[in-house]
């Protein structure tokens, strides 16, 4: 690991400007820095020319915990380098999806090519091309971050000067260290009244192993210190290495689907060069394509003459099949191509599974096409067809976490205009039956009948960082979720890091919400897979009129089975409309009933037409009704409306939350 050295960065290179004057100040600064005395336009045009010498290129990304200001800092960099004019500028410029902008989070990593002219030091006045990749911060999108890091030589580690180091800060730091990237530590949001940069600079320096004076101070909101940061990127991040005269090798680090142009593939060129109209080959599949367009993103796509060593850009081949462009694959020339592929990415393993079903069964082909397209944009998504007795045809989908699941469903509904039902999320279990055969269960309906010998569930190593005053309540919560304490460290007298090993099934519902509520929102959580462990798990079936409804079945720990059964039977009693006959709602483990509620019958008034007369006439009508209800109860079916499914399944986690 290469640590920051050289000049101490404590003084700030620009005064803080008030909110109202921020845009003009940045615009003036950008024009002053990027326009020479004889130029009428900013020299951003030099970055539009490709085949830049590798010594003039710097590839870096911004990594941080969620909501520490990555996208806002990227906005200031876009303004400062002049690639976005004032009229086009908007907050979170690189966050292209509506969901990202509404929630204020980054989901997809975005790359952009920036021009920069260094203002001081031995490189003063020299022009450089910076490739910036803005990455997500949430634990569910760690795979996006790891792919972005593969395309870089350096990383800006951003920490909120008012909140300090959090769990995902450490997780992203370790990802960058694994790839031997240059780390530039930066404190953001120094303009906040609650900011304490001196304290958190010490924390950051302690973790990285540098001096507190080596930590840069910036404000993504006002633009303060951003120019100095870009100078430091040029000075500290090494240029890309590669052989210009070697056969072409380029790594696919992302791809998107464009409805008009087909698959758009984002690559980082490692060796050789790539030009339009040449034929390329994918080394994993051997498929060949003709390049229709090669270009750069600055920050809008711009066609170019090609890409050279170390450059990042996009390729368009006109291919419509989303499976032809696999993230992690190596692109080479169809003629005289490279013999050895680049090291690809580790395939992400889904940690949470859920069923997605169209409300209208005729939308099933549309759902399949939508998942195919989304799979190209989201390499971590997996899915396979499945059928449910209650919900019809759908897909069993694998996700990296609950937020990933929620975002995927929302994108399917918005971008492809689908109405969907999602079943309760659950994890992957390994079940050993009595006869020694082994099956993998991702769906409660796959759980074997009869006795099982052993069950293994996935476990994760969790890292929780919180104020030390909340240690007691955090430990109580983790122990109630079958967690085992692995260690505890004080980052400072006020902040503590707790490490637990916990079953993944215990944290995928409402663990994070419970953690936040117990710590007044101050705790942060990160987790990574840590193998599996033996567990006492059972399948709880929900029976309506004696028939199991597969959509409501769940795999839970033996100690929690009774609570789950009670919760679901009570909820369904409220949600399912009353019938002409009494309907028992039961929860069962195998043949043993553990909870029961009755949905009372609707009483039809058969005596309404009798205005008097003989009591035997009334008794005859009542006996006839009684016989009819008895017959209906034996042959009648209970139809559960779609609204009840949606309410029961979506409120599953919320029900847990309210009871704690």
Swiss-Prot record:
It comes from the Bacteria. One of its GO terms (cellular component) is plasma membrane. It is a peripheral membrane protein. Its EC number is 3.6.5.n1. One of its GO terms (molecular function) is GTPase activity. GO terms for biological process: positive regulation of translation. PANTHER family: TRANSLATION FACTOR GUF1 HOMOLOG, CHLOROPLASTIC (PTHR43512:SF4), TRANSLATION FACTOR GUF1-RELATED (PTHR43512). HAMAP family: LepA. This is Elongation factor 4. The lineage of its organism: Bacteria, Bacillati, Actinomycetota, Actinomycetes, Mycobacteriales.
């Amino acid at each position: 690991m290469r640590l920051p050295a050289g000049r101490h960065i404590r003084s700030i290179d620009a005064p803080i400007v008030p909110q109202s004057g921020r845009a003009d100040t940045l615009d003036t600064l950008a024009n002053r820095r990027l326009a020479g005395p004889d130029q009428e336009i900013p020299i951003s045009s030099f970055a539009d020319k490709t085949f830049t010498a590798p010594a003039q290129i710097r590839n870096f990304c911004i990594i941080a915990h969620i909501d520490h200001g990555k996208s806002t800092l990227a906005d200031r960099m876009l303004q400062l380098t002049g690639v976005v004019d004032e009229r086009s500028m908007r907050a979170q410029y690189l966050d292209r999806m509506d969901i990202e902008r509404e929630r204020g989070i980054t989901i997809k990593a975005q790359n952009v090519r920036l021009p920069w002219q260094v203002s001081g030091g031995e490189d003063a006045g020299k022009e450089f091309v910076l490739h910036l990749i803005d990455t997500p911060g949430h634990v569910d999108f760690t795979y996006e971050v790891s792919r972005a890091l593969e395309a870089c030589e350096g990383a800006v580690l951003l920490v909120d000067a008012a909140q300090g180091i959090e769990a995902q800060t450490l997780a992203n730091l370790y990802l960058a260290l694994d790839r031997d990237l240059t780390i530039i530590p930066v404190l953001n949001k120094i303009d906040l009244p609650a900011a304490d940069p001196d304290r958190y600079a010490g924390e950051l320096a302690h973790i990285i192993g540098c001096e507190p004076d080596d930590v840069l101070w910036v404000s993504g909101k006002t633009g303060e210190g951003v120019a100095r940061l870009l100078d430091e990127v040029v000075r500290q991040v090494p240029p890309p290495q590669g052989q210009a005269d070697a056969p072409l090798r380029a790594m696919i680090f992302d791809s998107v689907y464009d409805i008009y142009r087909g698959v758009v593939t984002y690559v980082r060129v490692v060796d050789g060069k790539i030009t339009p109209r040449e034929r390329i080959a994918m080394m994993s599949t051997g498929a060949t394509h003709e390049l229709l367009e090669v270009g750069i993103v600055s920050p809008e796509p711009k066609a170019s003459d090609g890409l050279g060593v170390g450059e990042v850009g996009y390729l368009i081949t006109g291919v419509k099949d989303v499976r032809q462009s696999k993230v992690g694959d190596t692109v080479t020339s169809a003629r005289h191509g490279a013999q050895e592929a680049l090291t690809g990415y580790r395939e992400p393993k889904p940690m949470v599974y859920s069923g997605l079903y169209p409300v209208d069964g005729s939308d099933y082909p549309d759902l399949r096409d939508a998942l195919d397209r989304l799979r190209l944009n989201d390499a971590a998504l997996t899915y396979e067809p499945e059928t449910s007795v209650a919900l019809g045809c759908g897909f069993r989908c694998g996700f990296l976490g609950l937020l990933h699941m929620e975002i995927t469903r929302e994108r399917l509904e918005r971008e492809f205009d689908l109405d969907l039902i999602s079943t309760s999320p659950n994890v992957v279990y390994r079940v050993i039956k009595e006869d020694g055969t082994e099956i993998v269960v991702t769906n409660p309906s796959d759980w074997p009948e009869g006795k099982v010998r052993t069950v293994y569930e996935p476990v994760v190593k969790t890292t929780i960082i919180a104020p030390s005053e909340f240690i007691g309540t955090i430990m109580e919560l983790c122990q109630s979720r079958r967690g085992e304490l692995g260690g505890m460290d004080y980052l400072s007298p006020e902040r503590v890091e707790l490490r637990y090993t916990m079953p993944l099934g215990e944290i995928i519902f409402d663990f994070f919400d419970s953690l936040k509520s117990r710590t007044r929102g101050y705790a942060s959580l990160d987790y990574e897979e840590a193998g599996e462990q033996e567990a006492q798990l059972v399948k709880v079936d929900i029976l309506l009129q004696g028939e199991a409804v597969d959509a409501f079945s769940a795999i839970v720990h033996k100690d929690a089975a009774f609570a789950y059964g009670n919760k679901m039977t009570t909820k369904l009693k409220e949600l399912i409309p009353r019938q002409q006959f009494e309907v028992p709602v039961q929860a069962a483990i195998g043949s043993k009933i553990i909870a029961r509620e009755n949905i009372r019958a609707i009483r039809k008034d058969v005596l309404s037409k009798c205005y008097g007369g003989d009591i035997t006439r009334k008794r005859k009508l009542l006996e006839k009704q009684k016989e009819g209800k008895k017959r209906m109860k034996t042959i009648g079916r209970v139809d559960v409306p779609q609204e009840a499914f949606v309410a029961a399944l979506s409120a599953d986690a919320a029900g847990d939350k309210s009871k704690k």
